[in-house]
Amino acid sequence: MTDSDESSWIHWFCKQRGNEFFCEVDEEYIQDKFNLNFLDSNVKNYKCALEVILDLNPGSASEDPAEPELEASAEKLYGLIHARFILTNRGIELMLDKYNKGEFGTCPRAFCHSQPVLPIGLSDNPGEDMVRIYCPKCNDVYIPKASRHSNLDGAFFGTGFPHMFFMEKPDARPKRAKQKFVPRLYGFKIHPTAYRTAAEIQKDVTMTPVGEIDSPSHI
């Protein structure tokens, strides 16, 4: 990586605390207008935001939006570009490196034995849901452990990323977890109907009128 790469907005953004799930999108990818089709309708100040991402001179400062507003637009635009980029071969390679290093975290399920996870969105529309983590071992999704990731929009990773990832990198996919938790009481397995039966008994006791409850016999 060159000094110019390290001083770029993209590098700076990805190094911010809470942005560890992002990879650095190649500038060549962003410069190809075909890759940005229809994103202008989703981002305010689209042109200025794109110039921020690419470290271009935005022109007259008097015409620019207020800095916090522009920065928010740049971050949103980068996130939407990122969701597309990580479906490409180059993007998958970068995310594979992070996956192998465990940078996305591990599955909280005990029987998955700290299986590395991938980020996933529950919606492709920005603003609808936050990022989740997907475990390929138990095939389930969870809320990220670190609270700093709770503000990441799930649309910046997309609903299809893990599935494309493992289609391109099948060797990285672990075997599905077979071990399941079995509830026991005093060492015996609890029958699936036990809780329902107990609830029905409790309900019957609760609904029985006081006068109908048998009183103890007297000699």
Curated annotation (Swiss-Prot):
Q: How is it modified after translation?
A: Phosphorylated by alpha subunit.
Question: Which biological process, per GO, is one annotated for this protein?
Answer: Wnt signaling pathway
Short name of one Pfam family? CK_II_beta
Q: Which residues carry this modification: Phosphothreonine?
A: T2
Q: Does the keyword Phosphoprotein apply?
A: yes
| InterPro entries named among the record's database cross-references | Casein_kin_II_reg-sub_N (IPR016149), Casein_kinase_II_beta-like (IPR035991), Casein_kinase_II_reg-sub (IPR000704)
Keyword Phosphoprotein listed? The answer is yes
UniProt keyword terms in alphabetical order: Phosphoprotein, Wnt signaling pathway
Function text: Participates in Wnt signaling. Plays a complex role in regulating the basal catalytic activity of the alpha subunit.
Summarize subunit and interaction data from the UniProt record for this chain: Tetramer of two alpha and two beta' subunits.
The record's family statement is: Belongs to the casein kinase 2 subunit beta family.
Could you tell me which PANTHER family the record lists for this protein?
A: CASEIN KINASE II SUBUNIT BETA
Q: What is this protein called?
A: Casein kinase II subunit beta'
- Can you name the source organism? Drosophila melanogaster
